[in-house]
Amino acid sequence: VGMSIATLLSQHHDVIAVDVVKEKVDMINARRSPIQDEYIEQFLTEKQLRLRATLDARSAYREADIVVIAAPTNYDTERNHFDTSHVEEVIDLVVETNPDALMVIKSTIPVGYTRELYLRYARRFQQEERTAGCTHRKFRLLFSPEFLRESKALYDNLYPSRIIVGYPKFLKGEAFTEENKRIACVMSDHAEDDARLFAQLLKEGAMSDDVAVLFMGMKEAEAVKLFANTYLALRV
């Protein structure tokens, strides 16, 4: 996921790919694909991509306007849950080094996860500033599910069936009143604009002219991804 998005976006924008494996970083900087994907290999050798790779996550995030998070979230059968620890490590570092950056999760995550992250950071900001009210700090996070096939990831980004971007929305009902207030404290005043910006970046890199773009709440976007995975698994 990460390599295909990096390749797609680097057609028109400066992109820094971050990895913890030196061999992969060296391969990307030598214009060789670290994964088996015919289109990525072709683009690396034939296109003038604005792409470089680094092991220094802190430095990369400090310079970024947008951080796309494609960390692994392997399913933990013992806990019966996705392991989101790597995603959270990235978010923690971005918030520390560049709190104004827009973050977009591309990893597969549980339904309700991004909403819980908003609540978690709202509480953290309140605790750090020792207040029960809103702080001046904002948390800019979106979720954009991917629908990619193995070894065809870049092709599926170049010719996407649809683009979906989830951004924070308030849930209806008295049970969610307090949660909505906390999320309102930290969410960007331009969350929908952020979602439209990221969707436009994906469209800009695609080769399809007529791509369906859908905007929805983060929880709905998470559900769409998991339902799509379930459908494909049952369609063997």
Per-range role (PLM):
Residues R120-S144, L148-V236:
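Internal alpha-helical scaffold of NAD(P)-dependent oxidoreductase catalytic cores
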Residues H13, E63-A64, P160-S161:
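Short, well-ordered alpha-helix to beta-strand connector turns
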Residues D65-Y75, Y159:
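Gly-rich Lys/Arg/Thr-decorated short loops/hinges at beta-loop-alpha junctions or inter-strand turns
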Residues V1-R31:
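NAD(P)+-binding Rossmann beta1-loop-alpha1 motif at the extreme N-terminus of oxidoreductases
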